[in-house]
Design a protein with these regions (language model features):
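Beta->alpha turn/N-cap motifs
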Residues: 29-30, 53-54, 65-82, 87-89, ...
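N-terminal short beta-loop-beta anion/metal-coordinating cradle
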Residues: 83-104
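Hydrophobic residues within well-ordered alpha-helices
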Residues: 61-62, 151-154, 278
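Long, low-complexity C-terminal extensions of enzymes
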Residues: 268, 274-300
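Pocket-lining segment of extracytoplasmic ligand-binding domains
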Residues: 144-240
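Secondary-structure end/capping motifs
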Residues: 209-277
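A short beta-strand-loop structural module common to alpha/beta enzyme folds
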Residues: 44-56
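Bilobed "Venus flytrap"/periplasmic-binding protein-like clamshell domains
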Residues: 15-40, 51, 98-157, 162-168, ...
Length: 300
């Protein structure tokens, strides 16, 4: 569920207005700083913002129902030839992320052959969890489940949970009582020494060719929104704490320490490392997939 207002459906265009770019936004708490920043800087007025889960936003982008937006890393890698990556903006971590977790009733090494529930809202976190368990020699019996911890644990020995439900399990002791909590961001960092990127911001290649000025405008607005939100993190956390079941200190730890909104050389190295370890015919993208950025550069 979105934590801020979202466009429910397409709005019929008014003939005398120029169409604004249709921009997909993740409706999780992890994107709240960017949403706050867009409102504070006025960038929100320059786009038609549509909020949903990473999976739904990515599907709409690939279908042409959005011009640009957030897309889970796995879906971007599978469709890299159709998309252009916007530099210096991403959603990731460089250590514990707090909102992408494996919650288990037993040590991870005991999950071999055991039922493990995979949340249905993000393919990237699911694939990362599978990689991390395989690295430990564990091959569970996976099944997909709605992102509800109680439902997951009623049917499984462990569950992969992301987004707001995962953050709630992390910060609310009663929700994770008796469960072992493993942070996917921290596990990846210990394994590779690199940051992990869960979602990137991309534009459709045909839209970039048709409206390069709009793409640059949205890119500039996102960077300004991020920087404004980070410079006013105390205000963002205090506002969010007034209507969320978390204290401002917990939100500050999440927004400013856990989440990483950058896409620089180390983050790109993390993406290419993930592609190298996860890529192949079965995944729908090659291990050496090329990342094409808006500034014309490529990374591999």
């Amino acid at each position: 569920m979105a934590v801020f207002p979202a466009t429910v459906g397409p709005v019929p265009p008014l003939p005398w207005l120029r169409r604004r770019p249709r921009v997909g936004h993740i409706g999780f708490l992890n994107s709240l700083p960017l949403y706050w920043g867009l409102g504070r800087t006025g960038g929100l007025l320059d786009m038609e913002l549509i909020s949903d889960t990473p999976t739904s936003i990515g599907g709409a982008l690939l279908a042409g129902d959005l011009d640009m937006g957030w897309i889970s890393l796995v879906e971007y890698l599978r469709n890299a030839d159709e998309l252009v990556l916007l530099p210096d903006i991403a959603l990731g971590c460089d250590g514990p992320v707090m909102s992408c977790l494996i919650l288990s009733t037993v040590p991870l090494e005991q999950l071999d052959g055991a039922p493990v529930a995979l949340c249905s809202t993000s393919r990237t976190s699911v694939r990362l969890a599978e990689l991390l368990l395989a690295e430990r020699g564990v091959k569970p019996d996976y099944f997909v489940c709605p992102p509800d911890l109680d439902t997951m644990m009623s049917r499984a020995r462990a569950g992969v949970l992301i987004g707001d439900p995962a953050l709630h399990a992390m910060l609310s002791e009663e929700r994770a009582d008796g469960l072992q909590v493993h942070d996917l961001g921290q596990m990846w960092r210990e394994w590779t020494g690199l940051p992990f990127v869960f979602a990137v911001f991309a534009a459709r290649r045909d839209f970039v060719a048709r409206e390069p000025g709009m793409v640059r405008m949205v890119h500039k607005a996102l960077l300004k929104a991020r920087d404004t939100a980070m410079a006013n993190s105390d205000t963002v956390c205090r506002k969010a704490a007034s209507w969320m079941p978390y204290g401002s200190d917990d939100l500050a730890r999440y927004f400013t320490n856990a989440l990483d909104f950058r896409l620089g050389p180390r983050q790109l190295a993390g993406i290419t490392e993930f592609a190298l370890r996860a890529g192949g015919d079965a995944e729908g993208f090659p291990p050496d997939v090329r990342l094409r950025l808006l500034d014309g550069t490529e990374a591999q």
